Amino acid sequence: LQGIWNHSPYAPWDSKYTININAEMNYWPAEVTNLSETHEPLFDMVTDLAVTGSETAKVLYDAKGWVAHHNTDIWRACGPVDAAYFGMWPNGGAWLAQHLWQHYLFTGDKEF
């Protein structure tokens, strides 16, 4: 929940990026406020997650593509963590992809 803003070596929630809504909420204003460039760190994270998440998809689900569960970290871990009732949520990649789509809708950048 804290990402890079944590000051403690033993952070609450391990200072993970919670991608089942918390991280996304930080970027909701990016396009509607005409600050598209502020989306770039999130897009970099999505690019990284596509790499680590492809291994996770293959190992856990014998699937092509990539998957991210509800949390990730600086190493872009994608597997389920913490309690099963919320950790087994393989929709993080889909939620993050909404930001890619919103960026395209607002900018019309076909090369993106």
Regions found by a protein language model. Give the residues of each.
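Substrate-binding groove/exosite segments of carbohydrate-active enzymes
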Residues: 1-112
